Amino acid sequence: MSIKITTLVENSVYGKGLQGEHGLSLLVDTGGHRLLFDTGASDLFIRNARMLGIDLKNVDFLVLSHGHRDHTGGLHHFLQVNQKAEVVCKKELFIPKFKEERENGVMHPDALDSTRFRFVDEVTELCPSVFVFPRLAIADEEDTHFEHFFTLAGGNKQADTFTDELALVLKQGDEVSVLSACSHRGITNIIRVVQEYFPQTPLKLVLGGFHIRNTAKEKFDVIARFFENHLPQRLGVCHCTGIDKYALFHQCFGDRAFYNYTGRVEIL
C-alpha cells in the first residue's frame, strides 16, 4: 500500500500558481483515508489545494500538531469547507500561547464546534497504518525548543513546554515514517518514543520542521549526531528548520536529505 504526502503549505514555493507562507500543512492520502496534518496560518492551504485539484471536502481527519497560529490559523476555514472530518488534537491545544509578548495560539476557540473534536492522550490508530503519538517524552534536553515561548496558567505566564504537541506516524509493513510539524519537544526525542513503541522497526521517512532555524549550530549538531545512528531512508526538512540547516543536513547525509516545499509530493 502506497501513501501520498502532498505539502499544501510551507514557507517556500516553486510551482507556478501556488503560494507559500510561514506555516505548514500536509495532506496524507493512504488510498482509503485522507488526513490533513495542520492548516498553516490562513486559508492558503485551501487555495493551494484547489490549484492542485484536491477537494478538501473528502478529508476524513484533521490532525493538529500543536496550538501555534502558523499551524492552526486555517482551522476555522477548514471547518467551513469540510463538514465531516474529526479534528484530532490534545486538550492542551487551547491553552493560551505567546511568543514573547505576542499572542500565538488558536484563534477564537470559543467559536469552534466542539462536537467535531477528538482529544487524544494515548497512542491512537486513526485508520489503518496511521497513528497519532500524543505523549512525547523528553530523553535529551539538548534537543528541546522552548525559548521565548510562554503559556498562561492561573493568569500568570510560564514557560511553554509544549505538552500539546503530537506527532503523526505512518506504519507500512515493517517500516515507519514520522511526521512532526515543529518538533518543539525535539525530533530526536519524538523518534525515540516512536521506536520504543515500534521496536526494531526501520525508519522510512522523517518529515517536518525541527525548530533550529536561527539557532546556534550546536542545536543542529545534536540532531545530526542522532541521525548518524538512526538515519531514515528519506529525511525531509522544512518550515522552522531553516534553509541554512537544510544545507548542513545535505552536507552530512547527501541526497537522503531533501527540502520539503509547498506543492511537493512524496510517495511512500
Predicted regions mapped to residue ranges:
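Conserved beta-strand hairpin/beta-sheet module of binuclear metal-dependent hydrolase folds
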Residues: 3-52, 161, 165-180
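Structural motif
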Residues: 3-6, 34-35, 85-86, 129-131, ...
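Active-site metal-binding loops of divalent metal-dependent hydrolases
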Residues: 10-12, 39-42, 67, 92-93, ...
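Short, small-residue-enriched loops and turns at beta-alpha junctions
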Residues: 13-16, 156, 212-216
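Active-site metal-binding motif and surrounding structural segment of the metallo-beta-lactamase
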Residues: 44-92, 198-205, 231
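A short, polar/proline- and glycine-enriched secondary-structure boundary/capping micro-motif
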Residues: 46-51, 143-144, 188-192
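Cap/insert and terminal regions of metallo-dependent hydrolase folds
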Residues: 68-71, 161-178, 182-262
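Metallo-beta-lactamase
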Residues: 92-166, 253, 258-268
